[in-house]
């Protein structure tokens, strides 16, 4: 700025003596008038804020309603994933951590979760895939000896507790990305905060030692679903893998009915993935709450016993549950797994939706739980492409929202509500034990008796 400009500016900034005199003669408002005027302004601002909050559409709703070319599938998919949490029913990353680091997670050079792992799940892939919530499997395998007695729970329960521990610690280690949750409402709130809600699921009743007392304890530790069986029978039910090797499908046991009843009382999701087809039907006939299949596909499209037959899909509709379609190639295309692609996953989703309805389908990848993946679904980052392809096949935005998260959140909320109602009626914890249970022998030192027949009771141990 030149000196001349400065002079002009200075001249303009100085009022004349006459003008100054006029200003001085203007009556100033009294202190009472100033206070009143301020309060009026505050009232107007508050009133406007109230009107906005009551009548103006929330920002996420505005985003949802912005017009987008219906053929711009990528933008539609991005909008859907940005406003509705994609909640995956099953991911086995904690088990990989167990296998490869013995649950040591704090050395970020040895476990570069932020910068990238060769497996299916890490921070970069999660963010690229717009994952909105994850049921992390705190999986422990069945006994390697197929003839092992199922009442040998010591190591399985111990290892399950370790998996619960490492999963919680993993979530705590990355608080900018993950948020631990034990309820459907928390899952929704975490997504609004920009975090991936992280929930715990146990993959097999063997992991709780076939015990309802253990069931209650893992619930208290935050586990929110249990897969009734894994690839082995237990005290509760027959597994699909048992039927696959030619053994009879005995379905749900009497004790299994007590197990389901107690899960309903607690508010824990009953997961039917891995169970035999008869077990599926039996559980649907006795449960008081909606069920889930955390990672299963359609038996009509691929005759793998891990998949769900159409009659069971119809049963899920009546039950109000959800079938979360998985990406395991042998489940998608049992006759030729190597040729499975993302399009096969789309086919399975559409079939489940056609038979069960769009209110009863979800996504349960089984990422990091299978070495083989379909072409196009190599890892967690591929979810947006999956949604794009579904939209290309005619799926509406509303249907896609139900698929990716609204359905499982509804089921979870319903399970919680039913449990509250059951407990409100005064139902107490189930004290039943499995008939094949081997009780720990009494210690060989004198102990006082509680009853007249105590000696006989102790002989039964």
From Swiss-Prot:
Disulfide bonding pattern of the chain: 142-232
Family annotation (PROSITE patterns): RENAL_DIPEPTIDASE_1, RENAL_DIPEPTIDASE_2
InterPro entries per record: Dipep_AS, Metal_Hydrolase, Pept_M19
Binding positions for Zn(2+) 2 per the UniProt entry: 203, 274, 295
Region (Disordered), start-end ranges: 1-31
Record field: catalytic activity: an L-aminoacyl-L-amino acid + H2O = 2 an L-alpha-amino acid
Positions annotated as glycosylated: 379
Assigned keywords, A-Z: Dipeptidase, Disulfide bond, Glycoprotein, Hydrolase, Membrane, Metal-binding, Metalloprotease, Protease, Transmembrane, Transmembrane helix, Zinc
GO CC, alphabetical: membrane
Biological-process GO terms, alphabetical: proteolysis
Residue numbers binding substrate: 230, 306, 366
Major subcellular site: membrane
Enzyme class: hydrolase
Keyword Nucleus: no
Compositionally biased tracts (Basic and acidic residues): 1-10
Name of the protein described by the UniProt record: Putative dipeptidase CPSG_01350
UniProt: Zn(2+) 1 binding residues: 90, 92, 203
Annotated compartments: Membrane
GO molecular function, one term: metallodipeptidase activity
Chain ranges passing through the membrane: 35-52
Role: Hydrolyzes a wide range of dipeptides.
Cofactor(s), by name: Zn(2+)
């Amino acid at each position: 700025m030149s000196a001349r400009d400065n002079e002009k500016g200075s001249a303009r900034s100085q009022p004349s003596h006459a003008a100054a005199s006029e200003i001085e003669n203007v009556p100033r408002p009294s202190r009472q008038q100033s206070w009143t005027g301020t309060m009026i302004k505050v009232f107007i601002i508050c009133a406007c804020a109230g009107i906005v909050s009551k009548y103006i559409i929330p920002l996420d709703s505005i985003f949802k309603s912005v017009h987008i070319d219906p053929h711009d599938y990528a933008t539609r998919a991005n909008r859907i994933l940005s406003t509705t949490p994609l909640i995956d029913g099953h991911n086995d990353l904690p088990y990989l951590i167990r296998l490869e680091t013995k649950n040591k997670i704090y050395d970020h050079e040895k476990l570069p979760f932020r910068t990238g792992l060769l497996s299916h799940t890490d921070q970069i892939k999660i963010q690229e895939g717009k994952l909105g919530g994850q049921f992390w499997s705190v999986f422990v395998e069945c006994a390697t000896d197929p003839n092992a007695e199922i009442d040998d729970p010591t190591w399985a329960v111990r290892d399950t507790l370790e998996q619960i521990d490492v999963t919680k610690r993993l979530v705590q280690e990355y608080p900018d990305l993950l948020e631990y949750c034990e309820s459907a409402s928390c899952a929704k709130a975490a997504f609004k905060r920009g975090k991936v809600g992280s929930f715990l699921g146990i993959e097999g009743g063997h992991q709780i030692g076939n015990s309802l007392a253990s069931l209650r304890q893992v619930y208290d530790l935050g586990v929110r679903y249990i897969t009734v069986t894994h690839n082995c029978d237990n005290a509760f039910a027959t597994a699909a893998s048992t039927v696959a090797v030619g053994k009879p499908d005995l379905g749900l046991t009497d004790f299994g009915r007590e197990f389901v009843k107690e899960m309903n009382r607690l508010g824990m999701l009953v997961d039917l993935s891995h169970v035999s087809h008869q077990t599926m039907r039996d559980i649907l006939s006795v449960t008081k709450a909606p069920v889930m299949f955390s990672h299963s596909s359609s038996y009509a499209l691929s005759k793998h016993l891990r998949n769900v037959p159409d009659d069971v899909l119809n049963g899920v509709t009546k039950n109000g549950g959800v079938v979360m379609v998985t990406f395991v190639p042998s489940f998608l295309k049992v006759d030729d797994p190597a040729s499975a692609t993302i399009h096969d996953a789309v086919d399975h989703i559409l079939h489940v939706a056609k038979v069960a309805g769009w209110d009863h389908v979800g996504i349960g990848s089984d990422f990091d739980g299978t070495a083989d993946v379909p072409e196009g679904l190599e890892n967690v980052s591929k979810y947006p492409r999956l949604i794009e392809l579904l939209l290309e096949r005619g799926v509406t935005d509303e249907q896609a929202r139900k698929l990716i998260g609204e359905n499982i959140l509804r089921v979870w909320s319903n399970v919680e509500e039913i449990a509250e109602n059951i407990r409100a009626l005064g139902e107490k914890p189930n004290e039943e034990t499995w008939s094949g249970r081997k009780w720990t022998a009494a210690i060989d030192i004198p102990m006082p008796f509680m009853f007249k027949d105590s000696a006989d009771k102790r002989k039964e141990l």
